[in-house]
Amino acid sequence: MRKFLSLVFIAVLLSSCSTVKNQQLTNYQLPATNDVVMYQVNPRVFAPNNSLKAVEQRVEAIHDLGANVMWVMPIYPIGKVKSKNSPYSISDYKKVNPEFGTIADMKSLVKTCHANGMSVILDWVANHTAWDNVWMKNHKDWYTQDAEGNVIFPPGTDWTDVADLNYDNPEMRAAMIDAMKFWVTEVGVDGFRCDVADQVPADFWKDAISQLRKAAGGRKILMLAEGANPDNFTVGGFDMNYAWGFMGALDKVFVKGNKASDLIDCDKREYGEIPKGKIKLRFTTNHDEATKYSTVQQFGSVDGALAAFVATTFLHGGMLVYGSQEVAYPEKINFFNYVPVDWNSNPEVLATYKKLIAIYKENPAISKGYLETYPDDNVLAFEKTDYVNDFLILVNVRNSKQSFKNIPSQWQNSNLTDMMTGRNIRLGKDVELAPFQYMILKK
C-alpha cells in the first residue's frame, strides 16, 4: 500500500509539474497581428558578454517605449570555420552562444517579457548553417553540393561563411522543424522571424508553421518572414512579411527627392499583393540597414529620422523599432561586433518616439482604420478614420519649408487637436510646414 501511495504521489507531482510548465507557456497571449509594435534586439548593443541578462534588465524600458513584441536576433553558437563572426552563421540550433549567456538566461528573458506584456520571437536561420554545424559531420547530404560533391555557400550571394542547406532532403526538413519546436515548447518563445524566408521553399514553411502551431499547445505564435514573396502568406502561412519595397521608396523620397506621393503608390502596391488581414512590417531601419548608416545619417538629421518614422508607420502598419534608433544613435552599427549604445542619451528623442507610438497604439483609426490619401510632391498627406475618430496626417518629406495647398475641405475651419502638443488649431486651405515637420491632427 505504501509503495502504491508513493507511486500515486509521484504521478500527481509529475502531473502538477507538467501543468505548471504548461501554464507558464500558455498564460500569455500574443497581440493581434495588426496591433504589433515590434522591437528588434541586437544583443551586441547591450553588453560585450552576458548580453541576454543585459537585455532582461532593459525589458521595462522597452515595454515603456510601447513595444509589445520583442524580436531577438540569433542567439545560437557561431561557427568558427570560415567565420566572419556573424550571428547568422549557426553551429548548433539548440544551444546559446556563450557570449550571450545560457538557455536558462533566455528562459528568464522570456518570462520577464511575458510578465511585462511582451511576446518574444527568435530569429531563425533556415537557409544555411555554419560550416562546422553539428549536422555537417554526419549529414553532408543535408547540404547543397556542386557536381564534384563539394558543399557550397548559398548561390547568388557572397555569404562564404555559411553552407547552403538542401531542402530536397526530408530528413533535414524534419530536423529543422524539430529544432524550431524546441524553442517553442522548452523555452516558451512566441514565434520566429525567419531569415531570408524567400530562399526557403514555401511548402517547408507551410509544414513547419503548421507543426509549430500544434506544438504550441493552444498558444498563438507569430511568424514573420524576412521576404516580400506573396507565397509567404498564400502558401507558407506567415502572419507578416517585410516591406522592403516601402523601405526603398522611403529612401528615394527622403534622400533622392522623389515625389512624396510615391510612398502612397508603394503602399497600395504592397498591400494589394497580399491577402486581406496580413501585415507588412514597416521600418526605417533594422540590423541590415544600420550596417550602412543610422537613421540620423540616412535621413539627414534627428528631425528627418522622426519624419520618416511617422511616414512609415502611420500610413500603414506594422511597426518596427530597431534597438538604438529610439535614442538617435548617430553612427552605423556592425552587428558582427559589440557596439555600445548609451541608452540615456537624447532623452527628448526617446520621449518623442514614446509619444508617437502611444498615439499609434491608442487610436485604432490610425493603426488599422480606413485610408484616404491626398497626393503631393513634397508633403505626404493622408486621412485615417474608423468612422468615429478622424485623423489628418501631414509629413514634410523635405529638409526645407513646404506649403501644402490642398487641405481637404472637411478639415478646413474646424477645431482640430494637435496630437503631439495637445493644442487646438484651425486650418485654412493651406498650411506651411517647417523642414521635416509632421502634424497629426484629430477632428
Tell where the protein language model's regions lie, with residue ranges.
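Short glycine/proline- and charge-enriched loop/turn segments
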Residues: 85-94, 141, 156-163, 243-250, ...
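A structural motif
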Residues: 67, 189, 238, 317-318
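Active-site-proximal helices and loops of the catalytic beta/alpha 8
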Residues: 185, 195-283, 302, 311, ...
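Substrate-binding/active-site clefts of carbohydrate-active enzymes
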Residues: 20-53, 57-69, 74-187, 207-217, ...
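Hydrophobic faces of well-ordered beta-strands that scaffold small-molecule active sites
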Residues: 37-39, 70-72, 120-122, 192, ...
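Carbohydrate-interacting/catalytic domains
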Residues: 16-43, 47-71, 77, 302, ...
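Short, solvent-exposed turn/loop segments enriched in Gly/Ser/Thr/Pro and often Arg
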Residues: 71-83, 123-132, 195-201, 225-230, ...
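Sec-dependent N-terminal signal peptides
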Residues: 4-14
